[in-house]
């Protein structure tokens, strides 16, 4: 590991000397870029992530001197992937630089890819407002028109919103995805999942009347929904909430989970509902 660091520092020093010297046209930047790239690879082998990130930023600057925004963007992305392991703030900063350069050269797919990475980093840091912001950018990078965003991006925004206890926003998005999908042969099989997600968010609000009204709407939207395990789960959970019965709530979740494992997001939200239900049950016990 020490050898890799020593080699990396040697390449980096040689690159700095190239930049400080005189050369025709852009050759010194080309030579320095090659050396910085080698230095970055050495630092990565040594798992010296801060050094690797810093040297890739220097590499990006060389590419900018050579008027190559594409290569500069790639170098910033490489820097970010190193910083991800040691410095989230720097990782986000480098990804933002990469996005800006990809937008400049019209590489919208690459911009969207790195917006997604930024959103995931903010989610990791529990900064859900920022995660939502960058997930929105991912929908249609470089444009104000978000009229037909991909369902996966919208789903992520809805999930972040629910995690942040912004349930009405999450419900609105999940229901819109379901409406958009129900008449699409490729997407219609996912409708029950979106309606389940919307229903769980309804449960988090804790008011039984809107939950039951929502279930009626969902069955009108998709007539097949009433015969699904997802619908049965929501009906059983709504009944448990109405009866303030924690055991009934737990049994309904266990029954569903035994056949279709609940993911972490759904589990987190259902635990919130259960804790609220427990608190109500204890309150009732105290009163009696």
Curated annotation (Swiss-Prot):
Single GO term (MF): syntaxin binding
SUPFAM superfamilies per the UniProt record, alphabetical: TPR-like
Keywords: ER-Golgi transport, Membrane, Protein transport, Transport
Task performed by this protein: Required for vesicular transport between the endoplasmic reticulum and the Golgi apparatus.
Membrane topology: Peripheral membrane protein
Family: Belongs to the SNAP family.
InterPro entries documented for this protein: NSF_attach, TPR-like_helical_dom_sf
A single Gene Ontology CC term: SNARE complex
Protein name: Alpha-soluble NSF attachment protein
Compartments where located: Membrane
